[in-house]
């Protein structure tokens, strides 16, 4: 009977050891499945992120290729959307001739020659000759010590734009600033 109990005890011990091993393997398999699942999710997220990055890179390249034909304005100003939409129809007459009287400066023709580069023999010397022929008499005149005398009011208004054009420009400027599209 003692021997029988001893064999049963050994058998019980073996069963308990086997039971512990099975529990360990069960827990290990659950953990392995969880790690596999986490790794798969990480791999999917990585693929998704890489896919989005490559898609964004392609879109950026497409934008660059689309913007290259209009590169002249973009090179100078960055983006054509940022440029102000101004009415420049009368720019020459309104702004470049601002304050101009009937007299033209005597060196105006020489300046035109310089900018047009009228060189018959394609040499750079003739353009430099025009530069040395400029009227630089103002350099020989001494500076006035006192403040300049005030000009009559009639002369100040002679070169200004008409009041309605000024008001129009100011109203366009106010609209632009208040709209927030600047």
Curated annotation (Swiss-Prot):
Residues 32-81, 140-160 are annotated as: Disordered. Residues 1-68 form a coiled coil. Its main location: cytoplasm. It is found in: Cytoplasm, Cytoskeleton. Residues 140-153 have a biased composition (Low complexity). The keyword Repeat applies. Residues 32-66 have a biased composition (Basic and acidic residues). Keywords: Coiled coil, Cytoplasm, Cytoskeleton, Repeat. It comes from the Eukaryota. One of its GO terms (cellular component) is cytoskeleton. This is Tropomyosin-like protein. It comes from Pichia angusta.
């Amino acid at each position: 009977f003692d021997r029988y109990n001893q064999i049963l005890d050994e058998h019980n011990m073996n069963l308990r050891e086997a039971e512990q091993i099975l529990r360990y393997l069960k827990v290990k398999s659950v953990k392995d499945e969880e790690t596999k699942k986490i790794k798969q999710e990480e791999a999917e997220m990585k693929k998704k992120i890489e896919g989005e990055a490559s898609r964004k890179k392609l879109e950026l390249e497409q934008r660059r290729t689309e913007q290259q034909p209009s590169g002249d304005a973009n090179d100078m100003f960055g983006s054509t959307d940022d440029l102000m939409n101004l009415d420049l129809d009368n720019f020459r007459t309104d702004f470049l001739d601002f304050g101009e009287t009937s007299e033209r400066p005597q060196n105006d023709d020489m300046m035109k020659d310089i900018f047009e580069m009228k060189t018959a023999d394609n040499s750079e010397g003739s353009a430099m000759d025009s530069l040395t022929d400029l009227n630089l008499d103002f350099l020989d005149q001494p500076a006035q010590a006192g403040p300049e005398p005030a000009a009559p009011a009639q002369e100040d208004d002679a070169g200004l734009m008409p009041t309605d054009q000024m008001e129009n420009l100011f109203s366009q400027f106010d609209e632009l600033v208040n709209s927030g599209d600047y």
